[in-house]
Amino acid sequence: MKRIGIISDTHGTFDDTLREFLKDVDEIWHAGDIGSLELADTIASFKPLRAVSGNIDGGLTRRVYPDFLAFECEGVRVLMTHIGGYPRHYNPRAAAKIQALHPKLFIAGHSHILKVVYDPVYDLLHVNPGAAGEYGFHKVRTAVRLVIDGADMRDME
């Protein structure tokens, strides 16, 4: 069993509010627009970090963090990217990766809008954690926590 914190669009922000929300997770997964390699290092020193780069991330961050990251957690196949779209409207690169890798959990950021939806076409859970940072049009900063226990994804908040 692992407790996962999912964030995106921090744009250079990782403050006490986020630390408090994420203090009990086992890992943090960041869906891009980190803000800097230094901020990624700060997050990684707080909790183990898996991350992808986003459209505002510079060259150094892009060299360390890929556009797409595929991995398994507790037997659940995960695919994460920054700009992925939504069910029935995935961007072409994300759709190709989903079709090739068959993830059960697809995570994307970019929109700054928190949205969790089941995709019946690809039989996956799509999670966009919204924006955890202070910059952008969003009015409320958001992040997601969930438990992955075998094939069971639960206790999402």
Model regions and ranges:
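N-terminal active-site segment of His-dependent metallophosphoesterases
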Residues: 1-49, 57-75, 139-142
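Active-site-proximal segments of metal-dependent phosphoesterases and phosphodiesterases across multiple
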Residues: 57-102, 134-135
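Short, conserved loop/helix-junction motifs that constitute active-site signature segments
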Residues: 43-45, 98-101, 121
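Active-site neighborhood of phospho(di)ester-bond hydrolases with catalytic His/Asp-centered motifs
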Residues: 6-8, 27-33, 50-55, 79-82, ...
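Short beta-strand scaffold segments in enzyme catalytic cores
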Residues: 69-70, 115-118, 142-146
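Solvent-exposed alpha-helices and their adjacent loops that cap or buttress functional pockets
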Residues: 21, 72, 98, 117-119, ...
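Binuclear metal-dependent phosphoesterase catalytic core
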Residues: 2, 73-74, 101-102, 127-157
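Active-site environment of divalent metal-dependent phosphoester hydrolases
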Residues: 12-16, 34-39, 56-61, 85-90, ...
